[in-house]
């Protein structure tokens, strides 16, 4: 009987922990116009930011038919996040880059930092609060 009570307590606590391990982030992506697909990546660490889709804790794609694009995305609980979005105008499934570095399609980072070279996670990191909308402004 004692084992069953312990098991029930552990399962109950696991349920509480699971619900506390996720949060919703509200995102608005401005400047996309009406062509292509908008890709959104959310990173919770510098690992893979901003290029490696597989390192993102959330990825989503939206066929562009409205500006702005608005979404509520569920991500694992973390202290901070860095978001990257781009508009895949030619719909080839990737961000086209000149010499493998310079974006050739509209893109945006959270906090909209001015960057020369590869952006740093710390420059784009945000700590969203309940109800806050993170605005990403696409630029060429």
Give the positions of each predicted feature.
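Sec/Tat signal peptide C-region and signal peptidase I cleavage site
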Residues: 16-22
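Extracellular beta-sheet/turn segments enriched in Thr/Pro/Gly and aliphatic residues
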Residues: 105-140
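A short, solvent-exposed beta-strand micro-motif common in secreted/extracellular proteins
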Residues: 79-89
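Bacterial N-terminal signal peptides that target proteins for export
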Residues: 1-8
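A short, amphipathic beta-strand motif
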Residues: 25-32, 40
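Exposed aromatic-hydrophobic patches
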Residues: 68-76
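Acidic, glycine-anchored loop motifs typical of Ca2+
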Residues: 90-97
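Cleavable N-terminal signal peptides
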Residues: 9-10, 20
């Amino acid at each position: 009987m004692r084992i069953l009570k312990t098991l029930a307590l552990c399962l109950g606590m696991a349920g509480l922990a699971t619900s506390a391990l996720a949060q919703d982030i509200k995102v608005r992506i401005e400047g996309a116009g009406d062509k292509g697909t908008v890709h959104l990546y959310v990173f919770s660490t510098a690992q893979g930011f901003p290029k490696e889709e597989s390192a993102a804790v959330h990825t989503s794609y939206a066929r562009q038919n409205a500006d702005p694009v608005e979404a509520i995305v569920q991500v694992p609980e973390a202290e901070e996040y860095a978001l990257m979005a781009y508009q895949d105008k030619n719909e080839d499934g990737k961000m086209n880059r000149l010499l493998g570095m310079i974006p050739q399609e509209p893109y945006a980072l959270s906090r909209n930092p001015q960057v020369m070279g590869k952006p740093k996670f710390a420059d784009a990191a945000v700590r969203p609060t309940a109800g806050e909308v993170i605005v990403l402004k696409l630029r060429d």
